[in-house]
Amino acid sequence: MNIEKLYPACKSIIWGGDKLKKYYGKKTDADPLAETWELSFHKDGLTCLADGTPLSSVATEADLGENCKGFSFFPVLVKLIDANAKLSVQVHPADEYALKHENSLGKTEMWYIVDADEGAGIYLGFKENLTKEEFENAIADKTLTDYLQFIPVKAGECYFIPAGTIHAICEGCLICEIQQNSNITYRVYDYGRKGADGKERELHVAKALDVTDTNKFVPKSLDVPTKEGILKGISKFFTATLVKVNGEKMLTKDEKSFRCFTCLGGEGSVGNVDITKGDSVFIPAGYENAILKGVFFGIMTTIRKYYIAVNLDSSSIKGEIVDDNGEVIVSDKITTKSEGADDELVSNIAILSNRLLDRCNLSVSDVEGVNIACHQVLDRTKSEDISRILGGIKVVFAND
């Protein structure tokens, strides 16, 4: 498969605007234009090639890369979103609930702020801990937004929204959203507005009560320089990197994952495909000598695998989150006693692992396992204890 320009599914929703048509080259009758699904294998809106063929019917397993093979659904969906009015206050379920109740993946997502009007912002999580009863009462008496954290935003910022986090995009935001391949949304507040049928849009309060994390939300950002650009968000479902080109940039061959590049500013080319602001291109896994030329920037979406690497020596436990290309995402360490007991070492390995995961917005289920290099005596059977403390994660010792 060659590098291909992508043609998105276009969505008209009542809160949409006209910026994607005016400034990002989208040609569609959809009015207002709320979303363009730049990379989508989802049945509700398939991304196509120039001849109208869905990408999902053309791309082979080899084109997608080996990192996609372990998923029951293609894992990621990339959108551009133009909010001319507030989106509903909503929440998305995690995988376990979504698979049981919706036969779908859940939805963890990431927002890269492409543009924002003065005063624009987002609602993201609760200001303080709430009980489920307090949450339900706030929905009933229409005071929910009083409890939500409003964050003013500006272009270039990035926000990671784990499944179960209540949120809403507000008017004046133009966003590149990288998310799990899911279209499941539970609305809990919609400002009383009516849809095209003249009726208030459906709410999904009971399901939202099941899945919403009502604890105080603390936003975390990720800005990690890599060979390709600046890493902005990671999960087992997607890796999003801000890529800037000023001249020429060669992409290394990647057998493990496709790449999808969404141009958010400037113009140039990706291989033999000319691009400008608003365009997305698909680069198949294993493609050699993909050259980016011009002056532009955007988000590169791939699928990576992540590991916790732990190194024990006589005075410390050092840990890293590492991807399958050997890129170190974050690192940390805990100082230990020279003759620490095994149980203490096990506890500290678990503490350090959780600390590393938290810094990356990762959960245990997002990583492939813990790899331990041990330069002091630690009973190998303790791998079972480490695994149990970390929720069943695979633990291996180097050279075992």
Explain the meaning of each model-derived region.
Residues R359-V395:
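Short beta-strand-loop/turn "lid" adjacent to the catalytic site in phosphate-handling enzymes
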Residues Y306-E344:
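Short glycine-rich, Thr/Ser-proximal phosphate-binding strand/loop in the N-terminal lobe
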Residues A98-K100, I166-E171, C176-Q179, M250-T252, ...:
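Short beta-strand His + acidic residue motifs that chelate non-heme Fe in jelly-roll/DSBH
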Residues M1-L130, T185, D190-P219, A240, ...:
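Transition-metal
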Residues V78-K79, L87, E109-Y112, F150-I151, ...:
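His/acidic/aromatic-lined binding-pocket segments of jelly-roll/cupin-type domains
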Residues I139-I184:
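Loop-centered beta-sheet repeat module
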Residues S221-I275, D279, G286-Y287:
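Acidic/His-leaning functional-site neighborhoods
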Residues L148-F160, G271-N289:
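Short acidic-glycine-tyrosine-enriched beta hairpin
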